[in-house]
Amino acid sequence: DLVRSRGLGDVYKRQELDNGQIVTLTADGYEVTTFTGEPAEATPFRVEWDVTAAEKGGFNSFMEKEIHDQPAAVRDTLYGRFDEQGALTLDELRIEESLLRSVNKIIIVACGTAAYAGQVARYAIEHWCRIPTEVELAHEFRYRDPIVDKQTLVVAVSQSGETMDTLMAVRHAREQGAKVIAICNTVGSSIPREADAVLYTYAGPEIAVASTKAFISQIVAAYLLALYLAQVRGNMFADEIRGVVAELQEMPEKLQTLLDGADEIKQLGEDLAHAKSVLFLGRHVGFPVALEGALKLKEVAYLHSEGFAAGELKHGPIALVEEGQPVFVIVPSKRSRHNLHAKVVSNIQEVRARGAVTIVIAEYGDEDVVEYANHVIRIPASAGLMQPLLSTVPLQIFACAVAQARGLNVDQPRNLAKSVTVE
């Protein structure tokens, strides 16, 4: 990119260099050429953002601010993506509907937090679209000889759009004939440019290394993609799609309700800041939330933490539980299918009986968990697939509070970079 500015807030117009181009700055301006010196044209575009997005806005850290940005981030991700009747209008996809109807497999490629967003999305895609969906770590994808062809849709998820492993996965997928859709937050970055289409999340700049609002926005964007596929392929009736869109539209208000009660979660983080290890348990869409909660604690608090599918507890992880061990449990709604709620309550009983300090994330009105919980964090009631958008937030707040209680820099954790641009 060519940048001529007194500060980041002045950068609204950008010229994106394509592969094989260089720019020469002069006193009179600039010149874009190829490596062989032939004149070339860079791609111009405008970046729409507010300088206040790069300020802390009264918070102690960017991570805190970005956690509190999430209601607006969800609202911005949804903006303009459906009409007054609730039908999806993802015109930016630029992929023929006939090709989307022919898709017989979806592969989501991503790394880190984005991969966990992809795991959440898999449940929605398979439920709404009835398309077999895999989630691959991008850095493993091309090394295991994946089965990819013209009927495969690859979805590449990256906040920065510059994650090298994900970019290489995109290139490999396209070489095999697959269509690639990017879900990205950074306009004009490499992955969207090399993909066949892109869904931008428009969550605004994320300064803190540990991703928060980008994660939530990636899930929302993936849900929009899933609904659009279901609409195009006829897997859902129009009123069903309208119902899900209405639930998504309610998320900003529900998220704000959670954030208004953040002080209690912060206090819990301060109280448990000296723990040696923390476990996170979840089932169904709660499982990737458990993984993300553990990752956040590792990233910013340097605290050993592990996320597990709650059903795996008896297959080994329960051996880690000892007296005073903090264990977070994400409890599905009592309305969930397959008796999942009762099974997770049973898991809470199991770890509590072995001396764990149980921190339970459950909906308002769920009294079944109270008897076995040392602490209950309440979230607003929602449809099952919407719950990750809510249950993730307390885990973000907790990780940030633990790190701050330990005197750590939550915005710039050691050994980590915001964008991993090497393999």
Segments from the language model and where they lie:
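Single conserved hydrophobic/aromatic residue that forms the stacking wall/gate
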Residues: 1-12
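A SIS-like phosphosugar-recognition module
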Residues: 14-58, 62-66, 72-423
